[in-house]
């Protein structure tokens, strides 16, 4: 089993970025003014304080519920699965309530820096809707996992792993189809023409490009690829098309997102999820077994604590994989557009418009960054240009 896991991981790890590619050293001061670097650093510093504090508060809530679980379980009288669901919902709700001050602080910080146009009421509504989704998801997951644990005391984790992987695949197919109902077609003739050309170059002719209207909520610019099979799509935020980004920079974005699809990054992400889900479920089973197993409702809050700890511990690995695929999409974009100058301009503008730190601290990079740093991305553009004989 370990050999099969290793072979699968090795195959998924491979990318089209040349194995011997060496990124040149780049100095952020060559691309950003001192004022731009200071502003981005100041903005990110607040977020780097907020995240550890929010994480500590979250785990405090989870530990509290894990300790109180047995007493609360005895007071419900709803049966094992019903009691487990109640304890899980209470835990999720408590965690959401504890996160509220941090969410509002983040909204205040974004508004202070001109990045958010949403009101505090909008932020509260979004948190409420998120909580409803989390509660519904919790109802489903606890019902299934506890039923498996009660039926298969020692091997339930295998069935739970299958359930989570199947759920991940289903959501990857269904959610994009539902989300596409709120998207707009790409009505910019020049951008649409560029998209068709780049889709042909990258082999993504069958993937549509849509626009998501977010200008009333944020000034940030972004784009993303999502979906599997018939639901695959590239989505541009309308803020990317508001005149702040050049035609060449938008072409780089399009090629990058097409690269995610043509290099099967979303499917590979699900494959990694499967590879780590089963060991994660085994660890959960072993740790909860010491407290009587997940067949017992009183263990549910403790199980949520363990799952959260596993997720926190896996963040560095998840980010390494994400950054690797993002780098490959950058390489695809450079190969398709053959315009390293536009790529450098895009990465620079991402910082000046979104206040992203071009060169974050190492701990932040390891724990929080899903993309290569902006300086690493600029360095890759330089490396591509050098490999092509100077580039542009």
Roles of regions detected by a PLM:
Residues 295-304:
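N-terminal signal-anchor/signal peptide hydrophobic helix marking the start
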Residues 2, 9-66, 73-294, 308, ...:
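Polar-ligand-bearing catalytic/cofactor-coordination segments
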């Amino acid at each position: 089993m370990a050999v099969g896991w290793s072979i699968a991981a090795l195959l998924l790890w491979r990318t089209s970025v040349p194995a011997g590619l060496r990124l040149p050293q780049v100095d952020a001061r060559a691309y950003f003014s001192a004022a731009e670097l200071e502003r981005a650093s100041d903005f990110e510093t607040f977020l780097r304080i907020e995240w550890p504090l929010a994480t500590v508060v979250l785990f405090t809530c989870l530990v509290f519920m894990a300790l109180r679980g047995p007493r609360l379980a005895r007071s419900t009288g709803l049966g094992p699965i019903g009691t487990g669901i109640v304890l899980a919902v209470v835990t999720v709700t408590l965690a959401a309530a504890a996160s509220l001050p941090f969410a509002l602080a983040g909204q205040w910080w974004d508004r202070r820096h001109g990045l958010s146009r949403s009101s505090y009421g909008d932020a509260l509504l979004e948190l409420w809707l998120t909580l409803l989704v989390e509660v519904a998801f919790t109802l489903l997951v606890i019902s299934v996992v506890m039923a498996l644990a009660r039926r298969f005391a020692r091997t339930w984790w295998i069935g739970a792993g299958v359930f989570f992987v199947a759920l991940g695949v289903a959501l990857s197919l269904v959610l994009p189809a539902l989300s596409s109902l709120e998207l707009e077609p790409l009505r910019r003739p020049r951008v649409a023409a560029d998209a068709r050309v780049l889709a042909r170059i990258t082999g993504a002719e069958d993937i549509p490009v849509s626009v998501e209207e977010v200008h009333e909520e944020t000034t940030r610019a972004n784009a993303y690829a999502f979906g599997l099979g018939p639901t695959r799509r590239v989505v541009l935020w309308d803020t990317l098309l508001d005149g702040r980004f050049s035609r060449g920079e938008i072409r780089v974005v399009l090629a990058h997102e097409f690269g995610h699809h043509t290099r099967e990054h979303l499917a590979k992400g699900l494959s990694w999820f499967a590879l780590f889900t089963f060991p994660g479920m085994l660890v959960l089973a072993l740790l909860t077994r010491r407290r009587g197993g997940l067949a017992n409702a009183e263990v549910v809050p403790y199980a949520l604590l363990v799952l959260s700890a596993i997720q926190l511990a896996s963040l560095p690995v998840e980010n390494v994989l994400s950054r690797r695929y993002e780098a490959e999409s950058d390489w695809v974009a450079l190969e398709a557009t053959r315009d390293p100058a536009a790529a450098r301009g895009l990465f620079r503008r991402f910082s000046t418009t979104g206040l992203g730190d071009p060169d974050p601290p190492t701990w932040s990079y390891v724990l929080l960054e899903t993309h290569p740093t902006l300086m690493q991305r600029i360095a890759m553009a330089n490396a591509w240009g050098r490999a092509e004989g100077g580039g542009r």
